[in-house]
UniProtKB/Swiss-Prot annotation:
Regulation of activity: Inhibited by acetylation at Lys-661 and activated by deacetylation mediated by the deacetylases SIRT1 and SIRT3.
Biological processes, Gene Ontology terms: acetyl-CoA biosynthetic process; lipid metabolic process; long-term memory
Entry keyword annotation includes Transmembrane helix: no
Keywords annotated in UniProt: Acetylation, Activator, ATP-binding, Cytoplasm, Ligase, Lipid metabolism, Nucleotide-binding, Nucleus, Phosphoprotein, Transcription, Transcription regulation
CC per GO annotation: cytoplasm; cytosol; nucleus
Family label: Belongs to the ATP-dependent AMP-binding enzyme family.
Residues annotated for CoA binding in this entry: 219-222, 363, 575, 636
Region called Disordered, residue ranges: 1-37
Gene: Acss2
The name this protein goes by in its record: Acetyl-coenzyme A synthetase, cytoplasmic
Post-translational modification: Reversibly acetylated at Lys-661. The acetyl-CoA synthase activity is inhibited by acetylation and activated by deacetylation mediated by the deacetylases SIRT1 and SIRT3.
Known partners and oligomeric status: Monomer. Interacts with TFEB. AMPK-mediated phosphorylated form at Ser-659 interacts with KPNA1; this interaction results in nuclear translocation of ACSS2. Interacts with the 'Thr-172' phosphorylated form of PRKAA2. Interacts with CREBBP.
Amino acid sequence: MGLPEERRKSGSGSRAREETGAEGRVRGWSPPPEVRRSAHVPSLQRYRELHRRSVEEPREFWGNIAKEFYWKTACPGPFLQYNFDVTKGKIFTEWMKGATTNICYNVLDRNVHEKKLGDKVAFYWEGNEPGETTKITYRELLVQVCQFSNVLRKQGIQKGDRVAIYMPMILELVVAMLACARLGALHSIVFAGFSAESLCERILDSSCCLLITTDAFYRGEKLVNLKELADESLEKCREKGFPVRCCIVVKHLGRAELGMNDSPSQSPPVKRPCPDVQICWNEGVDLWWHELMQQAGDECEPEWCDAEDPLFILYTSGSTGKPKGVVHTIGGYMLYVATTFKYVFDFHPEDVFWCTADIGWITGHSYVTYGPLANGATSVLFEGIPTYPDEGRLWSIVDKYKVTKFYTAPTAIRMLMKFGDDPVTKHSRASLQVLGTVGEPINPEAWLWYHRVVGSQRCPIVDTFWQTETGGHMLTPLPGATPMKPGSASFPFFGVAPAILNESGEELEGEAEGYLVFKQPWPGIMRTVYGNHTRFETTYFKKFPGYYVTGDGCRRDQDGYYWITGRIDDMLNVSGHLLSTAEVESALVEHEAVAEAAVVGHPHPVKGECLYCFVTLCDGHTFSPTLTEELKKQIREKIGPIATPDYIQNAPGLPKTRSGKIMRRVLRKIAQNDHDLGDTSTVADPSVINHLFSHRCLTTQ
């Protein structure tokens, strides 16, 4: 794992102490004393006490935390009821059912009126261009959310309605999602990097009656005409018999055209004017955000909702190719993201927190919006990318806002490693106290660089494992309590009871490797797949009745640390984003030249994993560079740029079993030029394998 090398670099001056086992091997870094002194959980013993109580007495543990929030009416019945066993009936989880609350009221109104945080900065907004900056206080955010809630009400949005949001990382995105929550409407946020086809699919799946979007935005040097994509998506919806009745548009790149009194927020005009962006306007459907906000009152009574009412739908890739609408509910999600944020990042009131994730992903929902706001935190909201205008952008922002807690993805760390230490070390970073990673397992080399260069060997790293489906962190170190092992997500968070199962469903004790499952519910667990509870039960509970099945492999070492080994199902993790092989394959075979396709993951030095595609062509078609580019373009349009393959190989035949099943295990070996194929006795035509090896793409790893 590179630990001895890191030990040499540490020297006697390192404040992150190393622990050495009986055999002299490095076992991990202890939290620095200065972190422990002020930590909410200052020792491993204290963590173990709290974790044991949270698992053995979940109702009492979470009941005490629930007292920190406002409930319009108390829970009238059992605090927790659930069934994880498909053989005993319907799968369900209910926390505090019958209690009523509103998450927007808890994260805004209470912070302003009860906790007197009205003048505290909620977000520092940093635009794509350096110098495009603004800030918004809790009081200002509450006013804007109330105004936009009134806008939505005037458009007929009611409790239970679904609202699609397709926006870049601007303040209006936070305002829009909180306004939905205030009304009891479900927001369905679609990442602004997704295609018009993907947006259409998500609008149709949950029957969204309104779309909120933006004129356009820059991502680094690239101009994204988001309104054009939104229009294309709404046209596709109309063609399929579902006209969306209203589209509200934020004038973001065109903000400079607005008078000072017209601007709905404090966002400044963008520094790079964009006269070339042509916005098509659909009368009767399109409405300008700023015009609606001018007419809206700044007070809006929240809708009081059951703790088990849905809060939002967020789509994640499914192994069948059709995205799953993950449903999270109000009460349990609120408790869980607030608690994980407080303890995992060891949050204190003076902190400035920065999670670099886009709000279009679950990390952004939980740790850009809801978790920080529930704790009254000040956060950074960043529109740009880590390498624009230079490779030191992140660290200049850290210094600018004196960021104390920083949370990013391993893929970003690996990308920045390529540019060396200088872009990092020329900035102070003295404010940093805790670093975090999310999205995929971090390889030890990247962990060591992050620790040594970014954190100057004085910042604990919280390597967090969780999923869209879990709502918040599941396995994670705690900054003041957990000795860190590079690459390990370490131990379960409060309320989380992990187990490792073998193929027969038997729990493995001690050192073991197998399927990672969870034995009991935590408040943040998803409740269903929108409109398809059977799929929810089949995906997460059918394989091993009585357990929530993550779909990830896991290893537990002799010290009890958990190490995520990767997806067990046909899913790919590209730059921290989960992609379905079936979804990519479907996009490929829609091309007239492609008869059959198979997609596997391939190691990538920056993305972690990239797509390697095998395509079998229809008669009369020839494989060529032009066709390769056409296929890549088709995938970008159908799914989004994140799914663009790195490699596409011509495959006259695919290795299949005699029953016709494609042997993806063999294809993964071919992609990596690994001739150790294991048992191939079930391959119907072994000659196919030799041909694919001899014609494989030249890969970089």
